[in-house]
């Protein structure tokens, strides 16, 4: 029973990783896989420039 749960959990994590990578590849199909994520293609990426501009505006 313990082995079955471990195998199912591992398969679930593998599927999550596979579909997550597929979604990122579909968002930016011409991206270089070695270069890392493209912030323009990844809607969940942190936009540091916007945060810096907001902080600058807020602080004066």
UniProtKB/Swiss-Prot annotation:
- Which residues does this entry mark as bearing Leucine amide? 59
Q: Where in the cell is it found?
A: Secreted; Target cell membrane
Keywords, A to Z, come to:
Amidation, Antibiotic, Antimicrobial, G-protein coupled receptor impairing toxin, Immunity, Innate immunity, Membrane, Repeat, Secreted, Signal, Target cell membrane, Target membrane, Toxin
One term under GO cellular component: extracellular region
Any one GO molecular-function label of the UniProt entry? toxin activity
From the UniProt record, list the AXPX repeat ranges.
Answer: 27-30, 31-34, 35-38, 41-44
Give the signal sequence positions. 1-27
Family note: Belongs to the MCD family. Mastoparan subfamily.
Free-text function comment from the UniProt entry: Antimicrobial and mast cell degranulating peptide. Has broad spectrum antibacterial activity against both Gram-positive and Gram-negative bacteria (S.aureus MIC=24-32 ug/ml, S.xylosus MIC=2 ug/ml, S.alactolyticus MIC=16 ug/ml, C.koseri MIC=4 ug/ml, E.coli MIC=8 ug/ml, K.pneumoniae MIC=32 ug/ml, P.aerugiosa MIC=128 ug/ml, S.choleraesuis MIC=16 ug/ml, S.typhimurium MIC=32 ug/ml, V.parahamelytics MIC=32 ug/ml). Affects membrane permeability of E.coli. Shows hemolytic activities on sheep, chicken and human erythrocytes.
Q: What is this protein called?
A: Mastoparan-D
Query: Which organism is the protein's source?
Result: Vespa ducalis (Black-tailed hornet)
């Amino acid at each position: 029973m313990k082995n079955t749960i471990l195998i199912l959990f591992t398969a679930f994590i593998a599927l999550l990783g596979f579909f997550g990578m597929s979604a990122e590849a579909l968002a930016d199909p011409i991206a270089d896989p070695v270069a890392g994520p493209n912030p323009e293609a990844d809607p969940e990426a942190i936009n540091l420039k916007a945060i810096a501009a907001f902080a600058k505006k807020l602080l004066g």
